[in-house]
Amino acid sequence: DPNSPQYLGDLFSWSAIGARTTESQTHREMASGLSMPVGFKNGTDGSLGTAINAMRAAAMPHRFVGINQAGQVCLLQTQGNPDGHVILRGGKAPNYGPEDVAQCEKEMLKAGLRPALMIDCSHGNSNKDYSRQPGVAESAIAQIKDGNRSIIGLMLESHINEGNQSSEQPRSEMKYGVSVTDACINWEVTETLLREMHQDLQGVLSARLSQEV
């Protein structure tokens, strides 16, 4: 809902615009007024242009009708959001590897943007097989350990229990803690993966930050 983010904004610290919505001018304007980083997913075909153009648009000031912090309809004037980034979610093929990341960095620099990207471990990067998410995450962590400075985060699809289920079945037959949208890894796998990433990156991120200061 592009009308309510200013009213709900204090509840969130990060936002993402999906692959099919990144082209929307309404959502680009909305992103320009959010007081948080916003990620734009690459196109469903894997193209980067839409996400990069969305970042550039969201960094500019805009005016549009919305709802303010008091819940009142008003004309909002934004200053632009400098904290946009690309989310690599795959497309016709995965795009989380070192060559794909380097290509994204190159295109962002060409557009006058600071390379900043997030790796979506699900969707096209896992070929829609939720059990492959840890492998994608491990690749991204390896790139960071090898010196990559543009990868700023990872996206996982996680739930209490693994897999997914239809929301159209009788409620009495639905399983507790199982996604009704995309298939997810379970909490045990998620916790193990998070602990492993923390261990692998100890000292790495702090060193990267000290180099950027």
Swiss-Prot record:
Top-level taxonomy: Bacteria, Pseudomonadati, Pseudomonadota, Gammaproteobacteria, Enterobacterales
Keyword Amino-acid biosynthesis set for record: yes
Record-annotated membrane-spanning stretches: none
Keyword hit for Transferase: yes
Misc. comment: There are 3 DAHP synthases, AroF is feedback-inhibited by Tyr. The other 2 DAHP synthases are Phe- and Trp-sensitive, respectively.
Molecular-function GO terms, alphabetical: 3-deoxy-7-phosphoheptulonate synthase activity
InterPro entries for the chain: Aldolase_TIM, DAHP1/KDSA, DAHP_synth_1
GO cellular component, one term: cytoplasm
Family: Belongs to the class-I DAHP synthase family.
Keywords, comma-separated and alphabetical: Amino-acid biosynthesis, Aromatic amino acid biosynthesis, Transferase
Protein name: Phospho-2-dehydro-3-deoxyheptonate aldolase, Tyr-sensitive
GO biological process: amino acid biosynthetic process; aromatic amino acid family biosynthetic process; chorismate biosynthetic process
EC number: 2.5.1.54
Gene3D superfamilies attached to this UniProt entry: Aldolase class I
Catalytic activity: D-erythrose 4-phosphate + phosphoenolpyruvate + H2O = 7-phospho-2-dehydro-3-deoxy-D-arabino-heptonate + phosphate
Pathway in which this enzyme or protein is active: Metabolic intermediate biosynthesis; chorismate biosynthesis; chorismate from D-erythrose 4-phosphate and phosphoenolpyruvate: step 1/7
Pfam families: DAHP_synth_1
Function: Stereospecific condensation of phosphoenolpyruvate (PEP) and D-erythrose-4-phosphate (E4P) giving rise to 3-deoxy-D-arabino-heptulosonate-7-phosphate (DAHP).
